[in-house]
Amino acid sequence: GTGAGSPSEGYPKLLNAFAGTKFKIISGYPSSTAGMLAMERGEVDGALTSWNTLKRTKQQWLQNRDINVLVQYGTERHPEMRDIPTVLEIAGTSEGRAALAFYIGGAQLGRSLVAPPGLPAERVKMLRSAFDAMLKDRDFLAEIDKSGQEFYPASGEQVQKLIAATASAPRNVVELTETTLRAK
């Protein structure tokens, strides 16, 4: 893992607690790239990374089937990985699914564009309209395509719903998630 509090340690802890896995977390790798290199060297048996990163940096592994993708850390299956379950699908209890969904919600919000609180509604609407227009701009989309990055934008309204769902998570779900993540 890349350190306490990082997804590379959080997800395995949550899966150990709620899906019955027995991952041994090895801390101290400075980045997910270092974790992948450790796997390549045989220092560790697995690592957490994004599908996009795996496709861009380890294409040979995928082509040669040198790697097994065990689970997806998201709420829905990625279109290119229809046969790989999500963490929510393998959680053994409704409490486990709730804790994982809460944790995933925070990760999904991690890449949001935000404005300060109290911004007048008309400005929020204007910013959202400008953002939505950018998402339809041919030059912008061409740059995204050229970068090779996956791009799955969410509208301001979708992000607002995710924020509301995450912020209104029941206290017992928040506490269960915190307790599990803090456990040794």
Describe these PLM feature segments.
Residues 1-89, 93:
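Ligand-binding pocket segment of bilobal, Venus flytrap-like solute-binding proteins
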Residues 5-8, 29-32, 103, 120, ...:
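Solvent-exposed, acidic/flexible segments
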Residues 20-21, 44, 112-114, 149:
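A broad detector of the eukaryotic-type serine/threonine protein kinase catalytic domain
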Residues 28-29, 47, 112-115, 144:
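Long, contiguous hydrophobic alpha-helical segments, chiefly transmembrane helices and signal peptides
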Residues 47, 104-109, 165-174:
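Charged, low-complexity, helix-prone segments enriched in Lys/Glu/Asp/Gln
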Residues 57-135:
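C-terminal lobe and pocket-closing loops
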Residues 63-66, 90, 96, 118-184:
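An extracytoplasmic/periplasmic, membrane-proximal ligand-sensing/linker region
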